[in-house]
Protein backbone atom coordinates (compact mmCIF):
# COMPACT_ATOMS: atom_id res chain seq x y z
CA UNK A 1 0.00 0.00 0.00
CA UNK A 2 1.15 3.51 -0.82
CA UNK A 3 0.06 6.55 1.21
CA UNK A 4 0.56 10.07 -0.13
CA UNK A 5 0.08 13.03 2.19
CA UNK A 6 -1.20 16.09 0.30
CA UNK A 7 -2.06 18.06 3.41
CA UNK A 8 -1.72 17.63 7.16
CA UNK A 9 -2.21 21.14 8.57
CA UNK A 10 -4.96 22.28 10.90
CA UNK A 11 -7.82 24.74 10.58
CA UNK A 12 -6.55 26.92 7.73
CA UNK A 13 -3.97 26.43 4.99
CA UNK A 14 -0.64 28.12 5.73
CA UNK A 15 1.40 28.36 2.54
CA UNK A 16 4.76 30.08 2.66
CA UNK A 17 8.47 29.62 3.13
CA UNK A 18 8.03 28.63 6.78
CA UNK A 19 5.80 25.67 5.85
CA UNK A 20 7.41 24.58 2.57
CA UNK A 21 9.32 21.72 4.19
CA UNK A 22 6.24 19.99 5.65
CA UNK A 23 3.52 21.59 3.52
CA UNK A 24 0.83 24.09 4.27
CA UNK A 25 -2.36 22.35 3.09
CA UNK A 26 -5.19 21.11 5.26
CA UNK A 27 -5.90 17.34 5.54
CA UNK A 28 -5.93 15.15 2.46
CA UNK A 29 -4.36 11.71 1.99
CA UNK A 30 -4.54 9.27 -0.90
CA UNK A 31 -4.25 5.56 -0.16
CA UNK A 32 -3.37 3.35 -3.12
CA UNK A 33 -3.60 -0.44 -2.93
CA UNK A 34 -1.27 -2.83 -4.72
CA UNK A 35 -3.92 -3.30 -7.43
CA UNK A 36 -4.02 0.51 -8.03
CA UNK A 37 -7.35 1.21 -6.32
CA UNK A 38 -7.38 4.62 -4.66
CA UNK A 39 -9.17 6.05 -1.65
CA UNK A 40 -9.02 9.72 -0.70
CA UNK A 41 -9.18 10.46 3.01
CA UNK A 42 -10.52 13.96 3.65
CA UNK A 43 -10.94 16.85 1.24
CA UNK A 44 -8.83 19.62 2.74
CA UNK A 45 -6.92 22.06 0.55
CA UNK A 46 -4.44 19.30 -0.31
CA UNK A 47 -7.16 17.81 -2.53
CA UNK A 48 -6.35 20.42 -5.17
CA UNK A 49 -2.85 18.96 -5.48
CA UNK A 50 -4.24 15.42 -5.54
CA UNK A 51 -6.28 16.33 -8.64
CA UNK A 52 -3.20 15.71 -10.80
CA UNK A 53 -3.02 12.12 -9.57
CA UNK A 54 -6.56 11.47 -10.82
CA UNK A 55 -6.21 12.86 -14.37
CA UNK A 56 -5.52 9.43 -15.89
CA UNK A 57 -7.31 7.41 -13.22
CA UNK A 58 -10.59 6.23 -14.73
CA UNK A 59 -11.95 4.00 -11.94
CA UNK A 60 -14.57 5.41 -9.57
CA UNK A 61 -13.09 7.83 -7.05
CA UNK A 62 -13.80 7.01 -3.41
CA UNK A 63 -13.69 9.85 -0.87
CA UNK A 64 -13.96 9.18 2.86
CA UNK A 65 -14.64 12.24 5.00
CA UNK A 66 -13.52 11.64 8.57
CA UNK A 67 -15.77 14.48 9.78
CA UNK A 68 -17.27 17.69 8.46
CA UNK A 69 -15.03 20.38 9.92
CA UNK A 70 -14.13 23.10 7.43
CA UNK A 71 -10.44 22.12 7.23
CA UNK A 72 -11.44 18.62 6.08
CA UNK A 73 -13.78 19.72 3.25
CA UNK A 74 -12.57 23.13 2.00
CA UNK A 75 -10.58 21.68 -0.90
CA UNK A 76 -13.55 19.90 -2.48
CA UNK A 77 -14.58 22.75 -4.84
CA UNK A 78 -11.03 22.73 -6.28
CA UNK A 79 -10.91 18.98 -7.05
CA UNK A 80 -10.89 18.94 -10.88
CA UNK A 81 -12.53 15.51 -11.38
CA UNK A 82 -15.84 16.70 -9.89
CA UNK A 83 -16.29 18.86 -12.98
CA UNK A 84 -16.00 15.92 -15.39
CA UNK A 85 -19.51 14.89 -16.43
CA UNK A 86 -18.84 11.15 -16.71
CA UNK A 87 -16.66 10.86 -13.62
CA UNK A 88 -18.00 8.62 -10.86
CA UNK A 89 -17.41 9.85 -7.32
CA UNK A 90 -18.49 7.93 -4.22
CA UNK A 91 -18.49 9.95 -0.98
CA UNK A 92 -18.53 8.27 2.42
CA UNK A 93 -19.48 10.82 5.09
CA UNK A 94 -18.04 10.63 8.56
CA UNK A 95 -20.32 10.42 11.57
CA UNK A 96 -23.60 12.09 10.69
CA UNK A 97 -26.91 12.84 12.27
CA UNK A 98 -30.27 12.62 10.54
CA UNK A 99 -30.02 16.37 9.82
CA UNK A 100 -26.64 15.86 8.14
CA UNK A 101 -27.96 12.95 6.09
CA UNK A 102 -30.85 15.08 4.84
CA UNK A 103 -28.52 17.94 3.91
CA UNK A 104 -26.12 15.64 2.08
How would you describe each model-predicted region?
Residues 1-104:
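Binuclear metal-dependent hydrolase catalytic cores
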